[in-house]
């Protein structure tokens, strides 16, 4: 009988395959959230589904920030470079085409490939007005990274947005 551990299975694939596996896992995480939301929307309507989802994303933002800090052995986040690194490596962000740039003492985070929105459009649904969910996420995420870290939405549906960027957020100590 052959027994393999998880670690041994991971060691049988290349670094590039590990990266792709991570990206696929991140996409699956958002897929299950999207599928849950569509079913909740059918049962209870969009307003109640959004209210539930906001609570989930607020908790998730805090949990993700704390786990990423632990994974990266960061006790606290002291620089915008740290913020960008955490975002670019986090499972939630990896699957949405993240872009991070630092300009004028601010970190600007953009979503360029929003899989949940694309899936809704493909199903014939309208864009989800997800600004309140993004806000809830950052209400948990930003202070968990650093108590005085602030965020501001530049645009997010239902706001108008460019075709190549779904939402954009400003993060910093302001």
Indicate residue ranges for each PLM-predicted region:
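N-terminal accessory segment detector
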Residues: 1-108, 115-117, 121-133, 143-168, ...
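Long, well-ordered alpha-helical scaffolding segments within enzyme catalytic domains
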Residues: 134-138
